Amino acid sequence: MNLVVIGVNHKTAPVALRERLAFVGGDIQVAQAQLQQITAGSLIISTCNRTEIYALAPSTQLLANSDAALSKQSDLSLADEPVSTVDLTEQLITWLADFKQVPLEETRPYLYDYVDGQALTHMLRVAAGLDSMILGEPQIFGQIKRSVNQAKEQGFLTNQLNWVVEQIFAAAKRVRNETDVGTQAISLGYAASKLVTQIFDRPEETTFLLIAAGEMNRLVAQNIAGLGVKRILICNRTPERANLLAQELAHLGIQIEVHPLTELDSLLYQADIVSSCSGSMDMLIDKAMTRRALKKRRYKPMLMVDLAVPRDIDSSVGKLDDVYLYSIDDLQHVIAGNLEKRRQAAVEAELLVSHLVVEIERRFQVRKVGQDIHDYRALAAQKAEAVLNEALHELRTSEATAEEVMTELTRRLTQTLVHAPSSLMRRAARDGNNEAIDLIILGLKDAYRKK
C-alpha cells in the first residue's frame, strides 16, 4: 500500500513541542504544496492534541538535491527506483523539522511512525476516537473531515489517498455504530447535553440560560448549543466576557442575548435549561425564585445543572415537581461510571478495528490488481501494435508474400506473449521458488484450457 504516517500527540510529546509543530492558518497549504513533490498524495491533521502527516510513497519518486530536498527552487529529477516507505518516513521526519524550524534532535525522540497495515490501524483508531485524550470523543472525526475537505479543495488529495480516507471514514462509523465506545458521556459539557436530550424531545425548541460565562460554562454552552437550541440567554456580572462567548457561539445561527446578573430573577421563567457556574459565595437561585418561574411558565419542566462550588442553586430546588436538578457531583458520578463502560467498549472496538483493517487491505489488493491488469493489457496492446506496424510496413515495402508476413507476425506476437511468463519462471527457478513456478504454469494452462 505504501502508506506512511508520522506525528506527535498528547501521549508522546509535551504541549510546548506540539505547539511548535502545529500547523495554523496558511501553513498547511504551503506544507501540502511542498509534500506534493515527494509523495503520491499527503494529508496533514493538526489539532491541539496532535500533528500528523499521512502520505503515500510514489512508485516513481521526484527527488531534489540533498541540501534542499523539498524546496520549490530545487532542481528535481526522476529517480530510477521506487521510494520505499522507510525512505519516505525519513524524508517526512526531516522535512517536518525543517519546515517548522525545530532541530531534528529535539523532534525525533517524540515522533512516532507507522507504515501500511500499522498506519491504517493508527488512522482508524484516531478517526474512531480510540487514540483521543478523551476516549471515544467524536470531535476528532469532524476535524479529520475538515482537513480532508481542505486538501481536496486545494487539489492535494490524490485518488489513491482519497480512497484510503473513504475506507477509514466508513470503518470509523462502523466502530462507533457497532460498539458503545462513543455512547457514554465522559465530559461535563457532553454529560449536560445528554441530559438535555433525555429530558426534552425537541431540544431545538428550548431556551438555554447560561449563568456566568467562565471556561466550564463555555464548554457546556458549546455542547448544548450544538443540539440546535432555539435561544441562548447569557447572564453575567460584566458584559465583556459574556459578549465574547456570544460572539463565539454566533456562527451557529442561534438567537443570543446578553443580560446582567441582576436580571436573573426576571429571566429565569424563560429558561427550559439552566447551567450555572458563577464562583459566587452567595446562592443565586433559591426555591422561592424557582417557584415563581415555574408558575410563570405554567409548570413546564426545567433542567438545572449546577456546576459551581459553592453551589449557585439551592439543593431544595430539586425537590420541586417539574425541576430536574443536577450538581457537579451528580455529573461526576455519571462520568466515572460511563468512563469504565467506555473502557470496556474500547476492548471490543479494538478487535473490530483489527478486523476492519484486514478488510481494507484486501479491498486495496483487489483494487491494485485491477489497476495492474489494466496497465498490463495496455502495455500488451502497445507491443502488439508495434509488431503489427512492422508487419504492415513490410507488406508495403518488401517483396515478401502476405503469407510470409503473417507467419512472421504470428511468431513475433507469440514471442511477445510468452516472454514475460518465461522470464518469471526462469527467475523463480534461479531463486529455487518451485511454488511460484507451479503457480505460473498451472495458471497459464488453466487460461489456455478455457480458451
From Swiss-Prot:
One of its GO terms (biological process) is protoporphyrinogen IX biosynthetic process from glutamate. It comes from Psychrobacter sp. (strain PRwf-1). Substrate binds at residues 47-50, 132, 137-139, 143. The keyword Oxidoreductase applies. GO terms for molecular function: glutamyl-tRNA reductase activity; NADP binding. NADP(+) binds at residues 212-217. Pathway: Porphyrin-containing compound metabolism; protoporphyrin-IX biosynthesis; 5-aminolevulinate from L-glutamyl-tRNA(Glu): step 1/2. The record marks 122 as: Important for activity. The keyword Oxidoreductase applies. Its EC number is 1.2.1.70. This is Glutamyl-tRNA reductase. The gene is hemA. Homodimer. Possesses an unusual extended V-shaped dimeric structure with each monomer consisting of three distinct domains arranged along a curved 'spinal' alpha-helix. The N-terminal catalytic domain specifically recognizes the glutamate moiety of the substrate. The second domain is the NADPH-binding domain, and the third C-terminal domain is responsible for dimerization. The active site is at residue 48. It catalyses: (S)-4-amino-5-oxopentanoate + tRNA(Glu) + NADP(+) = L-glutamyl-tRNA(Glu) + NADPH + H(+). It is an enzyme of class 1 (oxidoreductase). During catalysis, the active site Cys acts as a nucleophile attacking the alpha-carbonyl group of tRNA-bound glutamate with the formation of a thioester intermediate between enzyme and glutamate, and the concomitant release of tRNA(Glu). The thioester intermediate is finally reduced by direct hydride transfer from NADPH, to form the product GSA. InterPro entries: 4pyrrol_synth_GluRdtase (IPR000343), 4pyrrol_synth_GluRdtase_dimer (IPR015896), 4pyrrol_synth_GluRdtase_N (IPR015895), GluRdtase_dimer_dom_sf (IPR036453), GluRdtase_N_sf (IPR036343), NAD(P)-bd_dom_sf (IPR036291), Shikm_DH/Glu-tRNA_Rdtase (IPR006151).
